[in-house]
A protein has these predicted regions:
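Mature, function-bearing regions of proteins
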Residues: 1-132
Length: 132
């Protein structure tokens, strides 16, 4: 299994309008999107697409049939993959619409899971690899 858990530190420091800073520990999941079912079955307190202490809901990521802003092109596209497509398929479709071919490759998502059903995820990172 390639999916894993990372302990991290979130830090913030602003100077204006009033100085404010904080730092705290969090954990993030690095999920190989081909292993979602395996992860879900391997850990008692982790669930896929349903409530648990820790859960991962695919619908929280790369929404279908909604416009997704592409800042590099200053435009929005509407992602319309097949009904009931997996998160990995939606990521691959989004990349293909932007001229990037990752079909058959690996996609790892680094993100914060839902905790007690509550989703607070300020940023997620997708690491996408082509087939070679």
């Amino acid at each position: 299994m390639q999916s894993c858990l990372y302990e991290c530190r979130v830090m913030h420091h602003r100077l204006v309008p009033k100085e404010h800073k904080f730092s705290y520990r969090i954990f993030v999941l690095a999920l190989d999107l081909d292993e979602l079912e395996t992860c879900h079955k391997a850990f008692t307190f982790f669930s896929l697409n349903r409530w648990n202490l820790y859960s991962f809901n695919e619908a929280d990521y790369v929404p279908t049939y909604e416009k997704i802003h592409n800042p590099s092109q200053n435009s929005s596209i509407k992602l319309t993959p097949a009904l009931n497509s997996s998160l990995k398929e939606r990521v691959i479709s989004y990349l293909a619409l932007n001229g990037i071919d990752c079909a058959g490759g690996k996609v790892t998502l680094v993100t914060v899971p839902r905790i007690f059903g509550y989703a607070f995820n300020p940023v997620s990172f997708y690491y996408c690899y082509n087939q070679t």
